[in-house]
Amino acid sequence: MEPFYIETNNIGLFKRRWGDICWIGFKESAPLQELYNKLFHKLRQNGFSLDNRPYTPHVTLGRKVVLSKKRDLKSLSLEIPKLLVKVSKISLIKSHHVDGKLTYTPIMTRTLDKSN
């Protein structure tokens, strides 16, 4: 798979009982969806247990976020400039707690090129 571009879209929240996760999402992207589908299938084939939640491509901006009651996500999204991001490699990352802190450990990284 060749490198491709994705564009940021809106600000969102994943509601959690211990505090919300604030994120910025990406516009629909056929190459990103294809990459997700391939990776999901391969991981399942290799015995990984995966969430069945809907796929929401995003970058986490903050955890345990509490927005001011004066702010709403729609107006906040309009204030954030849109960014075009080149996807040229992917990393499979394990999230786990170490000494009570959420830690991200890269398991594998692959560069995207025509031979993938």
Residue ranges and their predicted role:
Residues 1-116:
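Histidine-dependent nucleotide/RNA phosphoesterase domain, centered on the 2H-phosphoesterase fold
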